[in-house]
């Protein structure tokens, strides 16, 4: 029992360290991609090809002064960013990186992540109010209204996933897509979810909570030094988290569709599934399947991250009224209609699946025999 507890503690610490390092080098990746799109070189002086630039930025922030505004609530001013980071990191404990690596495999994993993400909105309003700044408070109000609008969209889209997979467990949702990813079945929800992710994380072109020409830098305008770094870490941790969630919900996590490659040996033809091939090699090299699944999963996540950066480099910013109108008058009715269509089609074909997901249930039904 003690050894199991120590194992989970070490795994949790490893996960937190991994997230923080990923955030650090995601900033370098983002600056390099933006520089490439804009025909610049980007950071290339600090270390080989600028690889130490995140470390230099971290040291710069740590060594800066951390003034507290007059009449600010000191407890909330310092506690807001810290609680925001803790909530951002706590959502990671139910995210599976492959079939064997997950800190806590709970049956309501998707509901847990959605709940923890919703709690972040309370800390944003606390951070904006505690600094006693009009700009920070207006930025917090904007952020809250924006996040609530697009959390509704994300929640409705998640209902589609639950209907098709028959589960709220991340692992079961992944394996329900082993024959066909939900990105192909729910292609409209796939694109709507990506747009809602941009709005949920206050990313361009929906970064209206920190519009420089209107609100200086949003709800964290009075925070500097380590407190600003905590906001920065929590924001990018949420971006990476949503990319992981989207990969699991729509791109099948670490699974690949049953692509078959051809083997000809002594005039005998074999058709071997890629997943089955790696499971066969597992008897000789135990970690081969773990490595293969992890690489597939990481590549999918970085495709999402690249899309985030590409959107930032190419699209203009929306007006605030346009963003809210798009959320409440277009996305919410559209996603509700898509939910009813998904439920109707599911009931029309074979009813709700009890195990394995609707797609697997559909492909194994009599219609394909």
Curated annotation (Swiss-Prot):
InterPro entries: NADH_UbQ_OxRdtase_su1/FPO, NADH_UbQ_OxRdtase_su1_CS
Transmembrane domains' residue ranges: 6-26, 43-63, 75-95, 108-128, 144-164, 180-200, 226-246, 248-268, 291-311, 330-350
Name of the protein this chain belongs to: NADH-ubiquinone oxidoreductase chain 1
Keyword set, alphabetical order: Electron transport, Membrane, Mitochondrion, Mitochondrion inner membrane, NAD, Respiratory chain, Translocase, Transmembrane, Transmembrane helix, Transport, Ubiquinone
A GO BP annotation: aerobic respiration
UniProt subcellular location: Mitochondrion inner membrane
Family to which the UniProt record says this protein belongs: Belongs to the complex I subunit 1 family.
Organism, scientific name: Acanthamoeba castellanii (Amoeba)
Highest taxon listed in the record's lineage: Eukaryota
GO molecular function term, any single one: NADH dehydrogenase (ubiquinone) activity
Recorded name of the encoding gene: ND1
């Amino acid at each position: 029992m003690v050894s199991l507890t120590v194992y989970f503690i070490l795994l949790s610490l490893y996960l937190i360290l991994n997230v923080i390092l990923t955030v650090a080098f995601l900033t370098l990746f983002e600056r390099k991609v933006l520089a490439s799109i804009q025909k610049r070189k980007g950071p290339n002086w600090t270390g080989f090809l600028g690889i130490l630039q995140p470390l230099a930025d971290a040291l710069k922030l740590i060594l800066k002064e951390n003034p507290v505004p007059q009449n600010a609530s000191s407890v909330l001013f310092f506690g807001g960013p810290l609680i925001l980071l803790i909530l951002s990191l706590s959502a990671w404990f139910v995210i599976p990186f492959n079939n064997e690596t997950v800190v806590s495999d709970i049956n309501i994993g998707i509901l847990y992540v959605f709940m923890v993400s919703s709690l972040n909105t309370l800390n944003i309003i606390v951070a904006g109010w505690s600094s006693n700044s009009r700009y920070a408070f207006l930025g917090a109000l904007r952020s809250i209204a924006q996040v609530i609008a697009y959390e509704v969209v994300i929640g409705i889209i998640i209902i589609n996933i639950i209907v098709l997979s028959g589960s709220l467990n991340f692992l079961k949702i992944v394996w329900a897509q082993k024959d066909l990813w939900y990105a192909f079945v729910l292609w409209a929800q796939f694109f709507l979810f990506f747009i809602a992710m941009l709005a949920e994380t206050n990313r361009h072109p929906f970064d209206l909570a920190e519009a420089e020409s209107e609100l200086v830098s949003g709800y964290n305008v009075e925070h500097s030094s380590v407190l600003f770094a905590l906001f920065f870490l929590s924001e990018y941790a949420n971006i990476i988290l949503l990319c992981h969630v989207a990969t699991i919900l729509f791109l099948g996590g670490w699974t690949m569709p049953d692509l078959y490659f051809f083997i000809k040996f002594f005039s005998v033809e074999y058709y071997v599934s890629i997943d089955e091939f790696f499971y066969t090699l597992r008897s000789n090299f135990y970690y081969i399947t773990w490595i293969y699944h992890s690489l597939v999963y990481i590549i999918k996540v970085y495709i999402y991250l690249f899309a985030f950066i590409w959107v930032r480099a190419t699209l203009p910013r929306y007006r605030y009224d346009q963003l809210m109108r798009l959320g409440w008058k277009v996305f919410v009715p559209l996603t509700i209609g898509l939910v009813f269509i998904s439920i109707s089609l599911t009931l029309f074909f074979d009813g709700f699946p009890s195990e394995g997901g609707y797609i697997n249930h559909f492909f194994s039904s009599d219609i394909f025999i």
